[in-house]
């Protein structure tokens, strides 16, 4: 019997991260029967920070850096990430070799009781500045309360009565078979999702040409183009996970429509921009939308946010 070559996949240990890694494993093994994948679970620095705010400790990159270190040390061949956890730009030594077909990118509201009985001054759980900003516009009287943990932990905190509602990504709930918990889907044109939300990225070393070729079979063109446009917005703005920035792209008949916003956490200022163009010019569209945001006062807003 010919021994199959083993591909080492590094990922976080949360149920959602393991689901995503298992999905990528199956995709690789189905497309390349001569390969066998092994999943390596990693507890990242972000996972270890159970009480501190991410904004005080380095941001979402803390969920990514340990996985990237495993790639650079050649302890793994590929790393599986939620794209929304990644920085706008890849370093020269690493690259996203495949963007897996995107799941539902929308944000959703999960309520402890019934949506119809949610009070105007409800305590809503989220740690995202982007969500806080848009929630204050959507429900001005609500009280925002920080929440940490994976999907299951956050749902348990809601069920225990610590919150009256929480905001999560539809994609994670659907992947974990928890779609029945969703009470309300936010319109992605009004309540704009996080950059890359719902998309999975498979990262590899830039010098590993064999792995790059292998990952091409997993790459979903439409997802790659949409995420490229969204990430270009943040690349030009220079935002981070502390900045209320959102961007969402869709493609129809090879035309890419990009919606973006930049605002203050309290929701009192929200700047919006939209652009439509050829999907092959995804990055240019993203840069143009970012320029529109800056021209509308985004430059001074960013300076204020970074003070």
Curated annotation (Swiss-Prot):
It is an enzyme of class 2 (transferase). GO terms for cellular component: cytoplasm. The keyword Transferase applies. InterPro entries: HemC, Porphobilin_deaminase_cofac_BS, Porphobilin_deaminase_N, Porphobilinogen_deaminase_C, Porphobilinogen_deaminase_C_sf. Pfam families: Porphobil_deam (PF01379), Porphobil_deamC (PF03900). Monomer. This is Porphobilinogen deaminase. It comes from Coxiella burnetii (strain Dugway 5J108-111).
């Amino acid at each position: 019997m010919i021994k199959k070559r083993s591909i080492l996949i590094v990922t976080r240990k949360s149920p959602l991260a393991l689901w995503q890694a298992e999905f990528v494993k199956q995709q690789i093994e189905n497309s390349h029967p001569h390969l066998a994948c092994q999943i390596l679970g990693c507890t990242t620095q972000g996972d270890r920070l159970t009480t501190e705010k991410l904004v005080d400790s380095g941001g979402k990159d803390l969920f990514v850096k340990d996985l990237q270190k495993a790639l650079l040390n050649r302890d793994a061949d590929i790393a599986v990430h939620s794209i929304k956890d990644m920085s706008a730009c890849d370093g020269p030594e690493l690259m996203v070799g495949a963007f897996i077909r995107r799941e539902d990118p929308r944000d959703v509201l999960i309520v402890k009781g019934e949506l119809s009985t949610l009070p105007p001054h409800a305590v809503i759980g989220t740690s995202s500045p982007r969500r806080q900003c848009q929630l204050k516009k959507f429900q001005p009287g609500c009280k925002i309360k920080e929440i940490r943990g994976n999907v299951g932990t956050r749902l348990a905190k809601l069920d225990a009565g610590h919150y009256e509602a929480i905001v999560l990504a539809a994609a994670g709930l659907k992947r974990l078979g928890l779609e029945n918990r969703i009470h309300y889907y936010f319109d992605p044109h009004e309540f704009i999702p996080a950059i890359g939300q719902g998309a999975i990225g498979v990262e590899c070393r830039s010098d590993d040409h064999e792995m790059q070729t292998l990952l091409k079979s997993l790459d979903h063109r439409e997802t790659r183009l949409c995420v490229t446009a969204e990430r270009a917005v943040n690349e030009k703005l220079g935002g981070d996970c502390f900045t209320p920035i959102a961007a969402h792209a869709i493609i129809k008949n090879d035309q890419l429509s990009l919606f973006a916003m930049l605002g203050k956490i309290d929701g009192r200022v929200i700047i919006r921009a939209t652009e439509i163009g050829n999907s092959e010019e995804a990055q240019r569209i993203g840069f143009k939308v970012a320029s529109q945001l800056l021209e509308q006062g985004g430059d001074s807003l960013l300076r204020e946010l970074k003070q």
